[in-house]
Amino acid sequence: MSGRIHPTAEISPDAVIGKDTSIWHWAQVREGARIGERCNIGKDAYIDAAVVVGDDCKIQNFATLYRGLTIGNRVFVGPHACFTNDLYPRAVSPDWKVIPTKVEDGASIGANATVLCGLTIRRFAMVAAGAVVTKNVPAHALVAGVPAKVVGWVCECGRPLDAKMQCAHDGKTFPELRVKRKARSRSRNRATNFH
């Protein structure tokens, strides 16, 4: 695949675009942004100044990636997903401070999800469509809802894991996730114990 930049895309001369990356209609990439190799940036996507996007990423139409965001390799960002960067937003604010956010390798952010700033979404985690992420997301976790909560676990291929933390699709198992699952269940049981 060879990359292409659509003539309507607005790319800052100070942005770095990796080899074989495609940028589609009316996308905007600001100064100091770095986009890796073999990425696909969808129509009307907005990539703010100094945002870092790794290799082999797919940023869908109308996704909004604000300053302070670092995205690893092979990350999927769905259409209309939004990453914020200010804890106390105001139209005019002399003390505006960018709060960094990180998405690790292989994670997926669903359509129309909102990720608040200052968080880390760990490797191969999956954020469901429409979720509002207000806390860090563990590796391989499937989070959904408003606010987003862990509702399951996923394989590197994105498919759900069973109770034994095994993927029915490719047979991979993740025994390290069993420990996390048990710890989460114990803390949840303590929180609901009213005795």
Would you name each region that the model predicts?
Residues 143, 161-166:
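Assembly/interface hotspot detector across virion components, adhesins/toxins, and nucleic-acid enzymes
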Residues 150-153, 165:
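Cys/His-enriched microdomains
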Residues 157-158, 169-171:
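Short Cys/His-rich metal-coordination motifs, predominantly Zn2+-binding knuckles/fingers
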Residues 3-144, 149-150:
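Structural signal for interior beta-strand "rungs" in well-ordered beta-sheet cores
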